[in-house]
């Protein structure tokens, strides 16, 4: 009977060792859970970005308005007969009147 109790205690000790400090231990599990959560958050951001790019591609394929807008904004192009005006702003901060 004593041998059985000692064997159970030794077995319990070995299992506790594996649980807390061996391979696939609880601390390692929690670290991996944090890494998974961070990766899923990053994946969600990338999926959102991909969706925006897909919508932009569809818009570019379907009509000329998006192409014209990109040409105007990114390449500085103007239509024939249009006049381009550049508005140069001064100080953008709004100051309140001093009292």
Swiss-Prot record:
Location(s), subcellular: Cell inner membrane
Membrane-side (Cytoplasmic) residue stretches: 1-3
Name this polypeptide is given: Cell division protein FtsB
Coiled coil, from the record: 31-73
Entry GO CC: cell division site; cell septum; plasma membrane
SUBUNIT field: Part of a complex composed of FtsB, FtsL and FtsQ.
InterPro entries: Cell_div_FtsB, FtsL/DivIC
Ion transport recorded as keyword: no
